[in-house]
């Protein structure tokens, strides 16, 4: 074990390098990340071209003159309601000079005013009286008063023009608003008090106060710019959120288990994105300073603000990655929070918020950032330089904002760390909410050695007869002690107990296997032992370290190597880089990292793939890499969860050898689904069932207690008589049973306790050659049978035991079940009649349409994108409607004094001030002052008139009172920043005069605006349709690219093999896609007509557009199909194609707009650009509509031909699709009735390579294949004939000028599969199995040779194959029943027959409970069952099974094997099966063929291959007295001189005996019986080589030179070393 030292710095650096490599190698993601940011930066850079910053110099007082000098009256006055009082008031108003000659009209209500206004040619001012003293003045928008309510502190309120200075505050004065207000106020006062003040109010003068210099931003552009600043880091933050969430979910818990510190994980991502933020903040500060958006504040101020804001967003992304589990949602949530909180920050720009509220809201970093930006704008406005913050100018607020952003960053990080601790991860690991209050969290004291409790010492269940006691030498070596461990998960409705009170020990120096069915709790137990999961109750100690203590867990991480069930690697790193990363995470010393990596690469034979990216590795290579990561650092404890899953036998044996070499002084615990792996590798097996401990012990113990016995396999010739052999066997062993028989083969079960009878039996078998026995072998009961017996299930033996119909099961109900399965499956042979021709074509179309519709229901992203596109079409309508409602409802702003002036006793606060009144009468004006004070206004009075109110802009307004003979005269001075100042001061003066006479009432004036009514437009709705059509032209990629998914999950290939016609596939898709797309058009037209119902003019053109829309739908959908077919091997990229369609359409619209009166150009555009066809038709139709409306000429019929263009496009794309299918599509199984594509027979090419040095069995098979090929008797022909197959692939060039070298996958392979036969095709990765399967299915065309399937040369045509691929070619969201019904329809079964067949198959394979379950919710075993059922559905004569039982537990494998045997036994069908699992081949195959380096190395029955190529027998003995071990070893070497001791575990001794030492078998058993009696053996077993051993022996011949490195990195083998005695 290598010394480890966990270093946060080393881990951080390793993870940081990993993150940089990810960014470099995932160029698409990195490009999008930076491109989005840079595009936003570019938008900010071009800002000066569309925005004007007002740098306004100081301005002296502006004199506006008397209010009655307004004489440019362009409006008439309408008022309501009409009463005596209002009539008197408005008559007085009408007598004013500026309304001379203008009409003042009274109308009864608002509706009457609207009707009058709509037909009146001049501008109208509406006066609406609420009561005598309150009224609304409503001016037309843009006339008489500004449209905005108020100026903001950062916006410009005055502008320099060529001739003069324009201030918006003067609009009220110059456009007549104040004049009309003064006239109405004077009339009200005169009518209600009989006191005329018309002269006083008409003589009021106005002035703008002196203005200081300012720099003002203005308009919506400023807000858009600020919004762009808010989202300036969004691209980085989105990808940071996605990456961190994804890595936390998939890898962090596993890396933590290896010793990763949390701080290293967060630092690695934080430092990476801090660097990105630093660069982006630098660019942003440069752009903002160069564009003069922020003028006076220094570069460092802007840079620090953006830098801290970006860092806070990174911290926020980390926090959300913990609270939100899905990566996409995390990025979306962070973006929405940024936008929402940032937009909330606009309130700081437009409102003066209380300081306490600003501090609280600044805990939201986007708000704090916007607060900082608002402060910078305000500083610019006030001309305060802010190169460096200084308290004297108020810029210390920027320092406070920066502090809050830094505080937010720390707060978000602290919350992220806290929530990560207390929220359970996917394994349920969590800490209590107040964990930080415990002293153990802050100081980890040295722990004391754990002392086993008394109940722990006595709790081991070894005393039970189902548990073998540990050998004496292991007493005291209990490394892992499991006591009363229970694990519960929350379920619906009850809790699920994964483990139930487990109690057992695991010993140092032993390899222990955890066995059990799927869901037994194996992975859960290993997760608990590795620290990933926490038990609900119970305790676990590992080398006296308690898993419940965090300090102990950290210590154990240095001792443990874990290989979880899922592969652990980063796909964007190479094999070496993955190993280096995890070596550093594990704390291997830096100087030893390279040496350790080199060791692992050599031991696992991965040197040749060390520079291959993990994403390019095969499944087996990824598994080997995960195992390599587990053994890094030579750990003392190995916890391996199915470490050899997906490995070929050669690689499995590599792993076994490595574990055997390391077991001394180490603890090795692994789980597996392969019973043979546990049998060979593990010293001790622990069986779990339903979470409970079932039994534990060595193989010999378990086989003796639950095994069936020995299996005697006899290979027979033609003269054999079964009854004679059975009689002979029973003569020696009466309780022997004939367990299975097949053509040329008998298998008997011999009880274990009858081994003393074996010598005489074998002697007689050798002595009677006339019995017809060619050879025989004996094998011990398998651990698989033990497992199934423990589970209470029946089994078929791995040497062909329990061939259905001949099974002698131990239980009657098992026998009935097996026979029933055979009857059910064989009954399907009668259902051979299927429909064909056009009827089948229509049925297939409906089936594919159903699939498309079901898939569409679950394509949420595509539907969401479609919905967003349609919603975008509502934007113009929505904006227009909103704006109309805003102004139709007329913003009403009361001109109250409290807009600008303080109330008495109110604390001063911005922007309110006191009202300054200057007395220049030379006398007392107390009566007026008292009247103004009565309006609840705080006054500052200059009683002596010494001040000039116009020179002091610190006040919002000032009133200067002068004396003019008998009356007062007034001069109003307003601060130019206060937009409504003049109307407010006019009301104050008016109420002051009214109060002097009648103090109990006040006049209230409100200002409003209204919109001018538009005129009807007979073709207005076309604009909306046009906008919608531009958007909907981008919809097809989201609707019609489903075929790419079908291609990638191989569903399309599976459908083709099942007999689907290419045209049926595309028309089935189109049936749904075109309908959906046409519904989009219907929706568009309906919404256009509804929203413009009053403006709609329905003509013949609009009716003709309906079939045009139908043709356009077909055209664009089939155009998308063509694109999907061409780019089927790449990514779907719906968004990119949608954008392309959109851009093309937009440019086409521009072309139409500029050439609408050129008749040829729009027609050419419409014809050449399919996405723009509908737009072109609409343009041309609108042009014809104009002609029909404004011309008396009859419309020409010729332009209507343009509506046929979409149908022409559809025909062109359909023909293109047909050509693509014919040229590049795979071999069709049936003749396509529409595309007219017939099944193509490949041209037979002579194989250039003559076979050399072939095995005699392979030569015989080649002759048999040639004879079958030339046979004219189709009834006797095999169902599969593969003759002289050769397949070459084009290799890659190693250099620009190097010659391309072809890679040969198969070399002159010939074999045939007879009726009723299952032929197993075995071989390592790269041996040529998959290529052979692809040639048979038609996926690959052979370079030479030919394949004939039953009926392809005559007789009944083979219309479909049965194919169970290695990858589950299933649709994730469809249920099991839906899959079965679709494939039944594709294969041509009538509905009634399909229902019967589905019911029978479901019952036979026990799939009733899963019928309504979506495939994505099924276990791997159920998916494999479904694939098998789909392959045999429709009773195909040829079935190809590629790893059919992969991923199944032993029980599921047995069910699958039974189904395979029942399906093909005594039928007209045949099957070709490929597998890595030798037990599967032994269980179901009549013959097996082993491929080596693309050639057939051998072929024949299993027993024949064992006898021919098997070199060893395995001898196991268990002694009672350990003192007998050495004498026994000497005796074995004397009896069997070439015996090689394999292992010795205390009382268990294992030897490998060469065949020549064992023959004759009778003599070998005779010797062993003597040994048993002489040495008082407890038990012994002698069994023949397994098929796996034969396979490995033959596989030594696969050499390195057969393939180049760049063809398939998995094909790297070396000669296995010979076993030494």
Curated annotation (Swiss-Prot):
Compartment list: Cell membrane; Basolateral cell membrane
Tissue-specific expression: Widely expressed with higher expression in heart, skeletal muscle and liver. Highly expressed in the superior frontal white matter and inferior temporal white matter.
Residues engaged in binding ATP 1: 516-523
Enzyme Commission number(s): 7.6.2.-
Catalytic activity: cholesterol(in) + ATP + H2O = cholesterol(out) + ADP + phosphate + H(+)
GO cellular component: basolateral plasma membrane; endoplasmic reticulum; intracellular membrane-bounded organelle; plasma membrane
Pfam families per the UniProt record, alphabetical: ABC2_membrane_3, ABC_tran, R1_ABCA1
Regions crossing the membrane: 30-50, 220-240, 268-288, 299-319, 327-347, 359-379, 397-417, 864-884, 1019-1039, 1070-1090, 1106-1126, 1136-1156, 1161-1181, 1197-1217
Domain called ABC transporter: residue spans: 480-715, 1285-1518
Domain of life of the native organism: Eukaryota
Membrane topology: Multi-pass membrane protein
Ranges in a coiled coil: none
An annotated GO BP: cholesterol transport
Residues linked to a glycan: 71, 84, 194, 243, 484, 555, 616, 724, 797, 919, 948, 967, 1270, 1308, 1373, 1435
GO MF annotation terms: ABC-type transporter activity; ABC-type xenobiotic transporter activity; ATP binding; ATP hydrolysis activity; ATPase-coupled transmembrane transporter activity; lipid transporter activity
Residues that hold ATP 2 according to the record: 1323-1330
Main subcellular location of this protein, as a coarse class: membrane
Keywords, in A-Z order: ATP-binding, Cell membrane, Glycoprotein, Lipid transport, Membrane, Nucleotide-binding, Repeat, Translocase, Transmembrane, Transmembrane helix, Transport
InterPro entries: AAA+_ATPase, ABC2_TM, ABC_transporter-like_ATP-bd, ABC_transporter-like_CS, ABCA, P-loop_NTPase, R2_ABCA1-4-like
SUPFAM superfamilies the UniProt entry points to: P-loop containing nucleoside triphosphate hydrolases
Family: Belongs to the ABC transporter superfamily. ABCA family.
Annotated PANTHER family: ABC-TYPE ORGANIC ANION TRANSPORTER ABCA8, ATP-BINDING CASSETTE TRANSPORTER SUBFAMILY A ABCA
Name of the protein this chain belongs to: ABC-type organic anion transporter ABCA8
Organism encoding this protein: Homo sapiens
């Amino acid at each position: 074990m290598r010394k480890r030292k966990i270093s946060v710095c080393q881990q951080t650096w390793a993870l940081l390098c990993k993150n940089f490599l990810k960014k470099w190698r995932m160029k698409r993601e990195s490009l999008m990340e930076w491109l989005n940011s840079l595009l936003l930066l570019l938008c900010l850079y071009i800002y000066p071209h569309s925005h004007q910053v007002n740098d306004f110099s100081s301005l002296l007082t502006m004199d506006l003159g008397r209010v009655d000098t307004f004489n440019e009256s362009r409006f008439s006055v309408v008022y309501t309601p009409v009463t005596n009082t209002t009539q008197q008031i408005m008559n007085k108003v009408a007598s004013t000079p500026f309304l001379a000659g203008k009409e003042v009209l009274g109308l009864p209500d608002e509706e009457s005013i609207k009707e009058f206004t709509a037909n009146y040619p001049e501008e109208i001012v509406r006066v609406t009286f609420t009561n005598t003293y309150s009224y609304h003045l409503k001016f037309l928008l843009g006339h008489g008063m500004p449209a905005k309510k108020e100026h903001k502190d950062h916006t410009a309120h005055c502008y320099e023009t060529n001739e003069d200075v324009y201030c918006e505050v003067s609009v009220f004065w110059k456009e007549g608003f104040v004049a009309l207000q003064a006239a109405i106020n004077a009339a009200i006062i005169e009518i209600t008090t009989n006191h005329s003040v018309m002269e006083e109010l008409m003589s009021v003068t106005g002035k703008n106060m002196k203005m200081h210099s300012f720099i003002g931003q203005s308009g919506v552009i400023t807000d858009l710019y600020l919004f762009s600043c808010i989202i300036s880091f969004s691209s980085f933050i989105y990808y940071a959120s996605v990456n961190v969430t994804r890595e936390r979910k998939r890898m962090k818990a596993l890396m933590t288990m290896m010793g990763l510190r949390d701080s290293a994980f967060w630092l690695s991502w934080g430092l990476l994105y801090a660097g990105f933020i630093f660069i982006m903040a630098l660019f942003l500060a440069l752009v903002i300073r160069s564009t003069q958006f922020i003028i006076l504040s220094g570069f460092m101020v802007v840079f620090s603000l953006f830098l801290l804001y970006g860092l806070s967003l990174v911290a926020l992304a980390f926090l959300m990655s913990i609270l939100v589990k899905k990566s996409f949602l995390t990025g979306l949530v962070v973006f929405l929070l940024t936008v929402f909180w940032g937009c909330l920050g606009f309130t700081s720009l437009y409102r003066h918020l209380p300081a306490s509220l600003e501090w609280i809201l600044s805990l939201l970093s986007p708000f704090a950032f916007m607060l900082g930006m608002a402060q910078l704008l305000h500083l610019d406005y006030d001309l305060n330089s802010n190169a460096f913050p200084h308290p004297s100018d108020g810029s210390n607020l920027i320092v406070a904002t920066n502090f809050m952003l830094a505080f937010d960053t720390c707060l978000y990080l602290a919350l992220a760390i806290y929530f990560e601790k207390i929220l359970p991860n996917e394994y349920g690991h969590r800490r209590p909410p107040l964990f930080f209050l415990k002293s153990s969290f802050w100081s980890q004291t040295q722990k004391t050695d754990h002392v086993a409790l008394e109940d722990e010492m006595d709790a081991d269940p070894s005393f039970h007869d189902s548990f073998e006691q540990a050998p004496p030498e292991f007493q005291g070596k209990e490394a892992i002690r499991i006591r009363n461990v229970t694990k519960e998960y929350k379920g619906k409705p009850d809790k699920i107990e994964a483990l139930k009170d487990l109690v057992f020990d695991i010993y140092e120096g032993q390899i222990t296997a955890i066995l059990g069915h799927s869901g037994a709790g194996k992975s859960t137990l290993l997760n608990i032992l590795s620290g990933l999961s926490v038990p609900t109750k119970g305790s676990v100690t590992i080398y006296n370290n308690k898993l419940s203590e965090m300090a102990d867990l950290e210590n154990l991480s240095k001792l443990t190597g874990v290989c979880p069930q899922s592969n652990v690697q980063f796909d964007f790193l190479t094999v070496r880089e993955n190993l280096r990363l995890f070596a550093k995470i594990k704390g291997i010393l830096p100087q030893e990292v390279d040496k350790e990596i080199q060791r692992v690469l050599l031991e696992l034979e991965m040197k040749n793939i060390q520079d291959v990216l993990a994403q390019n590795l095969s499944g087996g290579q990824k598994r080997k890499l995960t195992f390599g990561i587990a053994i890094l650092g030579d750990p003392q404890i190995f916890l391996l969860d199915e470490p050899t899953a997906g490995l070929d036998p050669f690689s499995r044996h590599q792993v076994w050898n490595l574990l055997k070499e390391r077991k001394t002084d180490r603890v090795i615990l692994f789980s597996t689904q392969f019973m043979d792996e546990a049998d060979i590798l593990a010293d001790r097996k622990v069986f779990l069932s339903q979470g409970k401990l079932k039994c534990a012990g060595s193989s010999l113990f378990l086989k003796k207690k639950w095994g069936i016995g020995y299996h005697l396999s006899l290979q027979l010739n033609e003269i054999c008589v079964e009854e004679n052999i059975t009689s002979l066997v029973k003569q020696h062993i009466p309780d022997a049973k004939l367990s299975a028989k097949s053509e040329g083969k008998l298998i008997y079960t011999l009880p274990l306790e009858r081994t003393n009878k074996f010598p005489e039996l074998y002697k007689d078998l050798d002595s009677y050659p006339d019995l017809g026995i060619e050879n025989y072998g004996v094998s011990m009961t398998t651990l698989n049978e033990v497992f199934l017996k423990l589970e209470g299930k029946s089994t078929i033996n791995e040497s062909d035991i329990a061939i259905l119909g001949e099974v002698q099961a131990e239980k009657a109900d098992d026998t009935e079940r097996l026979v029933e399965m055979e009857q059910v499956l064989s009954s399907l042979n009668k259902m051979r009649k299927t429909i064909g021709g056009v009827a089948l074509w229509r049925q297939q179309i409906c089936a594919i349409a159903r699939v498309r519709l079901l898939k569409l229901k679950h394509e949420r992203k595509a539907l969401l994108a479609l919905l967003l596109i349609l919603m975008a079409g509502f934007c113009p309508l929505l904006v227009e409607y909103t704006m109309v409602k805003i102004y139709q409802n007329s913003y009403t702003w009361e001109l109250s004094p409290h807009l600008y002036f303080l109330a008495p006793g109110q604390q001063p606060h911005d922007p309110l001030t006191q009202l300054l009144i200057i007395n220049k009468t030379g006398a007392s004006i107390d009566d007026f002052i008292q009247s103004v004070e009565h309006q609840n206004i705080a006054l500052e009075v200059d009683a002596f008139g010494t001040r000039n109110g116009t020179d002091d802009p610190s006040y919002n307004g000032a009133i200067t009172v002068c004396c003019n003979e008998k009356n007062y005269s007034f001069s109003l001075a307003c601060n130019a920043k206060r937009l409504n100042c003049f109307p407010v001061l006019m009301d104050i003066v008016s109420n002051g005069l009214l109060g002097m006479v009648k103090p109990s009432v006040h006049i209230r004036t409100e200002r409003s605006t209204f919109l001018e009514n538009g005129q009807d437009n007979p073709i207005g709705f076309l604009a909306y349709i046009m906008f919608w059509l531009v958007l909907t032209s981008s919809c097809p990629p989201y609707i019609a690219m489903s075929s790419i998914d079908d291609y990638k999950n191989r569903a399309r290939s599976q459908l083709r093999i099942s007999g689907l016609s290419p045209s049926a596939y595309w028309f089935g898709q189109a049936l749904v896609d075109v309908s959906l797309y046409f519904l989009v058009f219907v929706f568009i037209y309906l919404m256009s007509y509804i929203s413009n119902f009053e403006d709609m003019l329905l003509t013949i053109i609009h009716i003709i557009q309906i079939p045009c829309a139908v043709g356009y739908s077909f055209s664009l959908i089939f155009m998308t199909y063509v694109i999907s077919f061409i780019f089927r091997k790449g990514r779907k990229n719906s968004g990119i194609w949608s954008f392309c369609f959109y851009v093309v359409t937009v440019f086409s619209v521009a072309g139409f707009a500029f050439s609408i009166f050129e008749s040829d150009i729009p027609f050419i555009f419409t014809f050449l650009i399919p996405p723009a066809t509908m737009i072109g038709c609409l343009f041309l139709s609108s042009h014809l509509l104009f002609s029909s409306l404004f011309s008396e000429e009859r419309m020409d019929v010729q332009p209507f031909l343009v509506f046929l263009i979409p149908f022409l496009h559809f025909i062109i794309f359909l023909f293109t699709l047909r050509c693509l299918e014919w040229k590049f599509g795979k071999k069709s199984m049936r003749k396509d009735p529409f595309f007219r594509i017939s099944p193509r027979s490949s041209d037979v090419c002579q194989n250039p390579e003559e076979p050399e040095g072939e095995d005699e069995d392979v030569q015989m098979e080649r002759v048999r294949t040639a004879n079958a090929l030339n046979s004219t008797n189709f009834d006797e022909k095999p169902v599969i004939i593969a003759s002289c197959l050769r397949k070459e692939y084009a290799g890659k060039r190693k250099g620009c000028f190097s010659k391309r070298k072809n890679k040969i996958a198969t070399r002159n392979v010939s074999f045939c599969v007879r009726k009723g036969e299952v032929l197993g095709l075995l071989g390592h990765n790269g041996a040529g199995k998959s290529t052979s399967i692809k040639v048979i299915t038609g996926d690959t065309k052979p370079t030479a040779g030919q394949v004939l399937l039953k009926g392809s040369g005559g007789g009944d045509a083979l219309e479909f194959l049965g194919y169970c691929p290695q990858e589950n070619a299933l649709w994730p969201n469809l249920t099991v029943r839906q899959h079965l019904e679709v494939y039944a329809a594709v294969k041509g079964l009538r509905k009634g027959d399909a229902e019967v067949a589905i019911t029978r198959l479901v019952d036979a394979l026990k799939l009733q409970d899963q019928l309504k379950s979506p495939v994505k919710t099924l276990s791997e075993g159920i998916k494999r069952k479904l694939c098998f059922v789909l392959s045999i559905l429709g009773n195909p004569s040829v079935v190809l099974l590629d790893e059919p039982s992969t991923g199944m537990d032993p029980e599921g494998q047995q069910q699958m094997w039974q189904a395979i045997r029942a399906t093909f036994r005594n039928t007209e069908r045949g099957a070709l099966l490929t597998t890595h699992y030798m037990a599967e081949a032994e269980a179901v195959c009549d013959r097996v063929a082993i491929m080596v380096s693309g050639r057939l190395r051998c072929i024949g029955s299993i027993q024949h291959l064992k006898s021919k190529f098997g070199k060893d027998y395995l001898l196991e003995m268990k002694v009672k007295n350990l003192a007998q071990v050495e004498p026994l070893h000497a005796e074995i070497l004397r009896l069997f001189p070439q015996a090689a001791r394999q292992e010795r575990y205390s009382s268990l001794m294992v030897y490998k005996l060469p065949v020549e030492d064992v023959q004759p078998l009778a003599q070998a058993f005779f010797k062993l019986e003597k040994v048993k009696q002489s040495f008082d053996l407890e038990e012994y077993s002698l069994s023949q080589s397994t098929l796996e051993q034969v396979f490995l022996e033959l596989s030594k011949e696969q050499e390195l030179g057969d393939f180049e490195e760049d063809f398939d990195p998995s094909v790297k083998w070396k000669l296995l070393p010979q076993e030494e005695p």
